[in-house]
Amino acid sequence: MNKKLILALVLITSCFIAEAQYFTGFSIKSYRISSVWPTSFRSLRGSVTASIGNTGDTRKMSGITAKVYRNGKPFAQGVCEDVTFNKGTSTYTLNGEVKLSDGVSTWDAIAAALSFRVSEYTIDFTVNIKHPDGKMDYVVRAGMPLSHYLRR
């Protein structure tokens, strides 16, 4: 079961990192899972270390959430702690938590891990972006196929 939650953490974090490339001035140089530890049978916390280039001004991203759907049904949801991206290329640690959705049992997660097909998964993603001038953007990406992020 922990393998499936690790997969969900990787998916959500990878999507956040991949989605960041769509914000003007961001480029992802590299990323890796730094740590993963279970918080229960249905959730885990973890961190990803990423090298991110930002050619724009410093921006703070908050309210970072993602929901993973399997065959159109809620499967897992995750949140990432707020992060500030400074101008230039720097290494950041992104911390987050992933939980299985209500109605998804540990056995469902194990079965999904054993029969994983990328075509079965879609992701909703939201983030608030605060610019140096105080302007806030609320970004929503809904129903994006997981394959969209894995091709990057």
Where are these regions (language model features)?
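Sec-dependent N-terminal signal peptides
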Residues: L5-S14
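Sec/Tat signal peptide C-region and signal peptidase I cleavage site
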Residues: F16-A20
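Low-complexity, acidic Ser/Thr/Pro/Gly-rich terminal tails and inter-domain linkers that flank the onset
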Residues: Q21-L44
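Short, solvent-exposed loop/turn segments enriched in Ser/Thr/Gly
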Residues: R42-T49, T122, R141
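Asparagine-centered strand-capping/turn motif at beta-strand->loop junctions
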Residues: I52-T58
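Conserved aromatic beta-strand anchor motif in extracellular beta-sandwich/beta-rich domains
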Residues: V68-R70
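Intrinsically disordered, low-complexity Pro/Gly/Ser/Thr-rich segments with frequent PxxP/GP/PP motifs
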Residues: G72-D108
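Terminal connector regions
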Residues: S101-R152
